[in-house]
Every structure is written in C-alpha cells, then in structure tokens.
Swiss-Prot record:
The organism of origin for this protein: Yarrowia lipolytica (strain CLIB 122 / E 150) (Yeast)
Protein name: RNA polymerase II transcription factor B subunit 3
Methyltransferase is among the record's keywords: no
Subcellular location: Nucleus
Primary role: Acts as a component of the general transcription and DNA repair factor IIH (TFIIH or factor B), which is essential for both basal and activated transcription, and is involved in nucleotide excision repair (NER) of damaged DNA. TFIIH as CTD kinase activity and DNA-dependent ATPase activity, and is essential for polymerase II transcription.
GO BP terms: DNA repair; nucleotide-excision repair; regulation of transcription by RNA polymerase II
MF-aspect GO terms: cyclin-dependent protein serine/threonine kinase activator activity; zinc ion binding
Cellular component, GO, one term: transcription factor TFIIK complex
NCBIfam families linked: cdk7
C-alpha cells in the first residue's frame, strides 16, 4: 500500500503513528476512512459522506473492511455478489444450454451496467432487479440455500479427499519401508544359508527368491489404497439427448462386431513387440493390438451417413449404426460376426 493509502483522508491520522488503524469503506460510495472516524461521525445515525463533493447518505452498519487495495476491484466484487445473489437460477432450470448461457450473459451485462453505465441506466436496472427480487423471492431463497448446501458438500468432499490422499501416502510409505526391510532380510537369509547349508548356491538363491516373492505378494494384497472419490460421486441428471460429437463411421457402436480376433496371426512386425520389455511395461498385448487393427479396418462398413442423419432428424436414431442393405453390399450385418483370419503381415 502506498504512503497516501496509510493516511486517513478525513482525520489525517497515519498508520505510522497508529499501526492498529483500520480503514473501512461503504458500498454506497466506496470512499475510505478510518474506523475512528466512522465511530465518531456516524454514532448518532445516517450522515452525508464527509468526502468533498460526495452527497451520499451513509449508515454506520453498512461500513465494511476493505479487502482489495484497488477500490475498483472491491466495488466490482460487491456488485457481482449482489447481482448473483438475486439472479441465481441454475442450469437445470433451463431447457437448453444456449438458454442458460444467454442467462449468464445477461448477468454479466447487468454487472457491467451497474459498474460503468450512466446514472439513469443504473437506476433503471436497480429498480428492475429489485422488482425481480420481490416477485421471485421464494425461488431466490431456495436457490441460495441449495447453493450453500452444494458449497458445504464440496468443502466436505475436498476435506475428505485430502484425508484419503494423506492416508494413502502414509500407506505407500509404510509399504515401501516394509519392502526395503524384506529385501534386506532376504539378503541376510541368503548369506546365512550360503554359509551354513550344504546345497548348491543356485538352489539356495532360488529358494530365497521364492520366499521373498511370497512375502511381496502378500504385502501387495494387504496394501489397498482407499478410494478418493467413490463415496462423493454426484448423480448427474441425464439429458434427453446426449450432446456427443457426430462420427461418420459409427464403428465404435456396431454391435455385434463384424470380425472376431483370432488367438494367433503370422505377423512378423507386431509379434516381436510382445517380447519387448518397454512395450510390456505400457500394457501392450498382441490381442489388443490386433483388435485395434481389425476395428480400424472394419470401421464404418455398412453405414450410410445420409441415411443415419435422416433417421436422426426424424427422431428414430438410437445412437447405433444405420446400415444400408443393397444387392451389391458384400457385408451381411444379419450375421452375428464374421470370422477374419489374417495370414499376411498386418
């Protein structure tokens, strides 16, 4: 805060001489003055703002501590809170998302007018908001109450998830410590058996490794991280028409599939990848790779885009592929599946 900001414009007191001095503002005009001036000037009721040129009538109970250093930001936050406490309709109260977005845009326009509009525009909009608040008082109170409950729910969810993350972290640390202890115990056991047993070293090492593996497996089963959000999942209202992007293929919704993945293919390109440790670490499997290749090969067979769009416009689309059966169509969609066996390199 600047040096001028540390001096009360009314009594000229300085925060340098009074470090505990607090500055207050009134939402009527947002002129700043110290707490002592507020107590002194407004002790006997409403008084005109003591700042030169300001004719606003101020009340003592309306003064509040200034949160933001910039008064313009302070004013915008207060105006936004007042407007949104009245215009507080929820998204589920509108038929379409466009209607809800238009309502949000109207809120922003109202806030902008109250901040930057002319005096006549501000007065007209203020009267309009007051009339709306009076007419829809019950709905406004209900929505504000519901919003407070949701905020409380979100706070509880955040606190609960924070506790779960902390508990999972402690469990992971404990599991890591136990794994290190088992590793050191296995080393000591190996040294002890090599020194005392008459068996060959390879068999002793295998037995020690088997024992260590059993301990590790048992510890992994016991170590189960707690869920982070399962008990706080919200039930979302399903819309009558899901807003999903249109795909001209619809291969991901063709049931049953037009192919069947075989257990083995004579493939010299993809098959060696199954033995690569880097691919194995990422979860690579041959069957999943072949299934993806065949899915791409059969993507959209038997689907006519124009027919599907026409069915959707007529309200008959159920989200599945709409095949067009012709005499030249080589794909028979009536069959549950088509056996496909790739003999050459995919």
């Amino acid at each position: 805060m600047s040096e001028d900001g540390d001096i009360c414009p009314i009594c000229k007191s300085s925060r340098y001489l009074n470090p505990d001095m607090k500055f207050l503002v009134n939402p009527q005009c947002y002129h700043k003055m110290c707490e002592s001036c507020v107590d002194r000037l407004f002790a006997y009721g409403p008084v005109t703002c003591p700042h030169n040129g300001c004719e606003k009538i101020l009340r003592k109970n309306k003064f509040k501590t200034q949160i933001f250093e910039d008064v313009a930001v302070e004013k915008e936050v207060d105006v936004r809170q007042r407007v949104m406490s009245v215009m507080n309709k929820r998204e589920d109260e509108f038929d379409t998302l466009n209607d809800y977005n238009a309502y949000l845009e109207k809120i922003e326009d109202s806030i902008f007018t109250l901040l930057n509009g002319t005096a006549d525009e501000k007065d007209a909009l203020t009267k309009e908001i007051e009339a709306y608040e009076k007419e829809h008082k019950a709905e406004i109170i209900a929505n504000n109450k519901l919003r407070d409950e949701e905020d409380k729910y979100e706070q509880q969810k955040e606190d609960w998830m924070k506790e779960q993350r902390k508990a999972n972290y402690l469990m992971a640390v404990e599991e890591q410590r136990a794994a290190q202890e088992d590793k050191e115990a296995a080393k000591r056991e190996l040294v002890h058996q090599l020194a005392t047993s008459n068996k060959d070293a390879s068999s002793i090492e295998q037995n020690v490794q088997k024992t260590a593996l059993k301990r590790s497996s048992a510890r992994t089963v016991n170590f189960q991280p707690m869920p982070t959000s399962r008990y706080f999942e919200k039930v979302k209202k399903e819309s009558s028409k899901p807003e999903t992007p249109f795909t001209p293929f619809n291969g991901d919704r063709q049931i049953p599939a037009l192919f069947e993945v075989q257990d083995h293919y004579d493939d010299k390109v993809i098959e060696p990848l199954a033995h690569d440790i880097q691919h194995q670490a990422g979860g690579f499997t041959l069957k999943a790779a072949y299934a993806r290749i065949l899915q791409q090969a059969f993507f959209g067979l038997g689907v006519d885009v124009q027919t599907e769009l026409l069915a959707e416009e007529n309200g008959n689309s159920n989200g599945t592929a709409v095949p067009v059966k012709t005499e030249e169509d080589p794909v028979k969609l009536e069959e549950p599946s088509i056996q496909v066996k790739v003999e050459s390199t995919v």
